[in-house]
């Protein structure tokens, strides 16, 4: 596994443009050599900026062969603006012709209680099962990725899904891909912006025990850092 670090980006806007351009190129390459491509999206301010930038760049690709997944989801009402799916729909999915059948949104509160909904989604993944080509991830100031938080003990629902009933960030209830699922990916791309993330970035690069340290791509791990997020790196 190799690691690439882009660490001199001026801010979140430049980060989003750079990552989106690279992702469009990678999707084009993958579509040329595979029958389908499995892409895992992330939420957050920077993650959604990337999707907005990506939309016009992939409009001419054969997007009908792209399968869309999410790293995690807030367990709220289906059309809540807090949902990563709803934000991604506005930024990307409403602008490109990816078939509805290819969009694998995580459950909402309309799908039962947290455990039941997570179990149903786990069964869907088990029946598929996807081979993730590229996973996009943000990272919190505490080093969390998806809804995998430091010191938390989420409910394990099968091998690929966990349910978090008491997230330290609101809303408390969340569904997330597990470490096993994230680490199954060929490529993992971290999108991290802001001075408030700098200490966690440095800790991850020093190999400290944080969720982000535990995730890497089998082929490639790529970090997109703006200057603020990279400000505490020493080398």
Regions found by a protein language model. Give the residues of each.
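Glycine-rich beta-strand-to-loop/alpha-helix junction loops that act as flexible
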Residues: 41-46, 137-141, 193
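Class I SAM-dependent methyltransferase SAM-binding "motif I" and its flanking Rossmann-like core
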Residues: 134-137, 141-180
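A glycine- and small-aliphatic-rich helix-loop capping segment at beta-alpha/alpha-beta transitions
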Residues: 53-62, 86, 90, 150-159
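N-terminal glycine-/serine-/threonine-rich phosphate-binding loop
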Residues: 1-39, 115
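Ligand-binding beta-strand-loop-alpha-helix segment within the catalytic cores
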Residues: 2-3, 64-134
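C-terminal functional extensions of proteins
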Residues: 182-235
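Glycine-rich N-terminal segment of FAD-binding domains in flavoprotein oxidoreductases
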Residues: 28-57
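A short secondary-structure junction signal
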Residues: 116, 146-151, 200-204, 235
